[in-house]
Curated annotation (Swiss-Prot):
Chain's gene name: PAP1
Function: May modulate the action of carotenoids.
Record region (Disordered): 56-78
Coiled-coil boundaries: 85-107
Protein's UniProt name: Plastid lipid-associated protein 1, chloroplastic
PANTHER family: PLASTID-LIPID-ASSOCIATED PROTEIN 4, CHLOROPLASTIC-RELATED
Expression by tissue: Expressed in anthers, sepals seeds, fruit coats, and leaves. Very low in petals and pistils and not detected in roots.
Induction: Down-regulated by drought and oxidative stresses. Up-regulated by wounding.
Keywords assigned: Chloroplast, Coiled coil, Plastid, Transit peptide
Main location: plastid
Lineage, uppermost ranks: Eukaryota, Viridiplantae, Streptophyta, Embryophyta, Tracheophyta
Transit peptide feature range: 1-84
Pfam families (alphabetical): PAP_fibrillin
Compartment list: Plastid, Chloroplast
Species assigned in the record: Brassica campestris (Field mustard)
Family listed: Belongs to the PAP/fibrillin family.
């Protein structure tokens, strides 16, 4: 009795055809294999052969898991190592930044009450010098002249070891005139520096300033050439309050009996100050090689700048508006 073979049970086989003209092989009709018990067992259990074949050790290892993670190849271990190194570097950077901010706050606190260094004791000077050295070693911009935009703006002088400024800071000009502010304004686009000393008196304020050009000579050093000096006209103080008494050598002197006389003198002085204030500022040139100097920036960030000048004198400046000005 003939066996009927369903269409989906047929296996098509073709013989290879060679391109050689001498070959005698030709295409033949498909051979239909009848399904018998042996063939059926092969078809049914074919997946068993696949499972056993996957157990064979090849270049990827004993199983597919070894391809991605457990097998040590050129990608696996190094990725983990680089990740650990990156995390450690990031942690060290954060710790260094926090330590720098702490040192800045300590320095600002140490400068308080020193009158820009004039009134600092030897112990305080030594402490400030040590803090400056530590900050210089942590300079976040070791090549500050390659980041000139950080120099832009107005900087307030809060400390110096430059003895040439001490006579000015000691108020030898007049007992009633004091140095109110010393500042430096830098414009890196035009390569200009504007130094200003503002004086204050009971009636008015005035300033002495210099305009200069600077040239970049190295990643840290700039050459400064002063071109012009300016004496600002006095600006009248908005309001003056006469106290009821003053203390002289430990004794209080009552000013009420002569308050009327003082008011009259004040009005006269105010009139003179208004007349002077209407005049233009006095400008004068600064010729010669003596009007040149250089500055070495040893620390720079968005709030704090430390520079060293001729003879090793140090200048500590804080950007206007920074919270470091109010420790």
């Amino acid at each position: 009795m003939a066996t009927t073979v369903p269409l989906f049970s047929q296996f098509t086989c073709k013989t290879p055809i060679t391109s050689s003209s001498t070959s005698s092989f030709q295409s033949k009709s498909p051979i239909l294999l009848p399904i018998n018990p042996i063939n059926r067992r092969i078809a049914v259990h074919r997946h068993d052969f696949k499972v056993r074949a996957s157990d064979v050790n090849d270049e990827w290892g004993p199983d597919s898991k070894g391809r991605g993670g457990d097998v040590d190849d050129e990608w696996g271990p190094e990725i983990g190592l680089n990740s650990s190194v990156a995390e450690k570097v990031a942690e060290e950077a954060i710790e260094s930044a926090e330590e720098t901010e702490r040192l800045k706050r300590v320095l600002a606190g140490s400068l308080y009450g020193t009158d820009r260094g004039l009134s600092a004791s030897s112990e305080t000077r030594a402490e400030i010098s040590e803090l400056i050295t530590q900050l210089e070693s942590k300079n976040p911009n070791p090549a500050p002249n390659e980041a000139l935009f950080l120099l832009n703006g107005k900087w307030i002088l809060v400390y110096t070891s430059f003895v040439g400024l001490f006579p000015l800071l000691s108020r030898r000009i007049s007992p009633l005139v004091k140095v109110d502010e010393i500042s430096q304004t830098i414009d890196s686009d035009s390569f200009t520096v504007h130094n200003s000393v503002r004086f204050a008196s009971p009636l008015a304020t005035t300033s002495l300033s210099t305009n200069a050009k600077f040239e970049v000579r190295s990643p840290k050093r700039v050459q400064v050439k002063f071109e012009q000096g300016v004496i600002g006209t006095p600006q009248l103080t908005d309001s003056i309050e006469i106290p009821e008494f003053v203390e002289v050598l430990g004794q209080k002197i009552d000013l009420n009996p002569i308050k009327g006389l003082l008011t009259s003198v004040q009005d006269t002085a105010s009139s003179v100050a208004r007349t002077i204030s209407s005049q233009p500022p006095l400008k004068f040139s600064l010729p010669g090689d003596s009007a040149q100097s250089w500055l070495l920036t040893t620390y720079l960030d968005k709030d704090l700048r430390i520079s060293r000048g001729d003879g090793g004198s140090v200048f500590v400046l804080i950007r206007e508006g920074s919270s470091l000005l109010n420790p």
